[in-house]
A protein has these predicted regions:
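Long, low-complexity, charge-biased intrinsically disordered regions
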Residues: 1-214
Length: 214
């Protein structure tokens, strides 16, 4: 896995199912939307305009936190290194990377998580959620956009800083929660105090030049 500068910071191994072998009775919906690019850009620009904080939150092993419905049971062949009795099979009760409906199950999971925390789902973009609360006459607003296992968070609510802890208390693992500096391959230079917001893809350009030996 690479950091925001393209440097490799760690190596990962992941158990992946052979989803192309799944039968029709082992899954239902497979479609999993992500936030529109215009939604993401508008959120970031509004965050800059109203001097709000902009965060990125990344769920670790996101798909593994979703629960498979009992109406579509899935069984796995023996996994190398794991011994099962001759008359037993491995029953999959959680989401697993590679299964055809893993993305959709995770989408349902993150939707339930945000809705249960008081957020409202937008009509025009189902991957946009928002919440407003008023304390002592002051209004706080939080906007969250989902992109697979990443959350883009724009907020002026001081409680947003506790979001990582809140999600972890609900059983989710968070691998990253910090102020935005790079998102979906775009470098985002945002300084609320200096009123600065710029975008660039210098890292991507450098990668292209290196691949072309230039």
């Amino acid at each position: 896995k690479a950091d925001e500068h393209g440097n490799v910071v760690k190596f990962k191994a992941r158990l992946v199912a052979l989803g192309y072998d799944m039968r029709k009775d082992e899954y239902k919906e497979t479609y999993a939307p992500v936030a529109r690019w215009t939604t993401l850009m508008i959120m970031i620009v509004l965050g800059w305009y109203y001097l709000m904080d902009i965060y990125l939150l990344d769920f670790k092993g996101a798909y593994l936190h979703s629960t498979r419905p009992t109406s579509t049971p899935v069984y796995l062949y023996d996994i190398p290194g794991i011994k099962t009795p001759p008359d037993k099979m491995i029953y999959l009760n959680k989401g697993l990377y590679g299964t055809l409906d893993a993305g959709n199950l995770w989408r349902q999971t993150v939707e339930k998580l945000l809705l249960s925390n008081g957020y409202t789902q937008a009509i025009n973009d189902p991957c946009l959620f928002y919440k407003t609360r008023t304390i002592n006459g002051k209004t706080y607003k939080t906007y969250i956009a989902t992109w697979v296992d990443d959350l883009l968070i724009v907020s002026n609510d001081p409680e947003t800083k506790n979001m990582k802890k809140d999600f972890e208390e609900k059983g989710f693992e968070i691998s990253h929660f910090d102020k935005i500096n790079k998102y979906l391959g775009v470098n985002v230079n945002y300084d609320k105090e200096k009123d600065i917001l710029t975008f660039d893809q210098c890292d991507y350009i450098d990668e292209i030049l290196q691949n072309a030996n230039m």
